[in-house]
UniProtKB/Swiss-Prot annotation:
Function noted in UniProt: Activates expression of the rhaSR operon in response to L-rhamnose.
CDD domains xrefs: cupin_RhaR_RhaS-like_N (cd06977)
Gene Ontology MF terms: DNA-binding transcription factor activity; sequence-specific DNA binding
Site feature (Interaction with sigma-70) residues: 246
Name of this chain's protein: HTH-type transcriptional activator RhaR
DNA-binding region: 196-217, 244-267
Subunit-level organization: Binds DNA as a dimer.
Source superkingdom: Bacteria
A Pfam family it matches: HTH_18
Length: 282
């Protein structure tokens, strides 16, 4: 694309030896589609927004983790108090003898799965390492770059230890109710979600859980689930031959007319218009 925005190394790294640094987004504003001359890890701490990665939309909130390659196109829209950090790095500058490909999905041709989640325990451990990494990446002493790379190695190992697929929180996990709730919602794309049954199973207060969810994500539980379903519908409309009524069912809407109303309200266009526009841009 002729007018594609490209983020350059020279605007983020202090010199050609620096391999890794941290870019804070407190908060992350709307950001047009772009690629990079470097790679990045994206950690979402709070709030919510729409992250479009290689034309696939993700409704993101606390605990979402992305591995972004240099050539990937992504953007941020519909942000609401979205707080995240980008840990940016240049693969060719890394010197430590670590199996980076085993730690980082998509690293120099490794199998790429971009979207993961971290529970509260993993987030807390990652935050501690990122704070140290940010301090070293801003340092000027002779060993700052080496220390930053050591911490980056510790970070990617920490992330690998604690990350899990968005709909697959390990059964042995000691994560919080909020983590379990977000995983349960990700498993409810096609079927109704019963919050009262979830709270009964977890022996928790429905009112308190609603308050905690809104405080951390900036959305109600129903808003989040609806927007996750709409993101899934957008992807299916663009990348599958399914009929709109079939997509409606796969995204938890038994009534395709109601699905169309909700989809139009959330995206500003009907499902048919979205599919037509997406096919034109391919």
């Amino acid at each position: 694309m002729a007018n594609q925005l490209i983020l350059l190394k020279k605007d983020f790294f202090t010199d050609e030896q620096q391999a890794v640094t941290v870019a804070d987004r407190y908060p992350q504003d709307v950001f047009a589609e772009h690629t990079h001359e470097f790679c990045e890890l994206v950690m979402v701490w709070r709030g919510n927004g729409l992250h479009v990665l290689n034309e696939r939309p993700y409704r993101i909130t606390r605990g979402d983790l992305f591995y972004i390659r240099a050539e990937d196109k992504h953007s941020y829209t519909s942000v609401n108090d979205l707080v995240l950090q980008n840990i940016i790095y240049c693969p060719e500058r890394l010197k430590l003898n670590i199996n980076w490909q085993a730690m980082i999905p998509g690293f120099q041709g490794a199998q790429w799965h971009p979207h993961w989640r971290l529970g509260s325990m993993g987030m807390n451990q990652a935050r501690q390492v990122i704070n140290q990494l940010e301090h070293e990446s801003n340092g000027r002493d002779p060993l700052a770059n080496e220390m930053a790379e050591l911490l980056f190695g510790q970070l990617v190992m920490t992330l690998k230890r604690h990350r899990y697929a968005t709909d697959d929180l390990p059964a042995t996990s000691r994560e919080t109710l909020l983590d379990k709730l977000i995983t349960a919602l990700a498993n409810s794309l096609e079927c109704p979600f019963a919050l009262d049954a979830f709270c009964q199973q977890e022996q928790c207060s429905e009112r308190v859980l609603r308050q905690q969810f809104r405080a951390q994500t900036g959305m109600t539980i129903n808003q989040y689930l609806r927007q996750v379903r709409i993101c899934h519908a957008q992807y299916l409309l663009q990348h599958s031959p399914l009929m709109i009524s079939e997509i409606s069912m796969q995204c938890g809407f038994e009534d395709s007319n109601y699905f169309s109303v909700v989809f139009t309200r959330e995206t500003g266009m009907t499902p048919s218009q979205w599919r037509h526009l997406s096919n034109q841009s391919d």
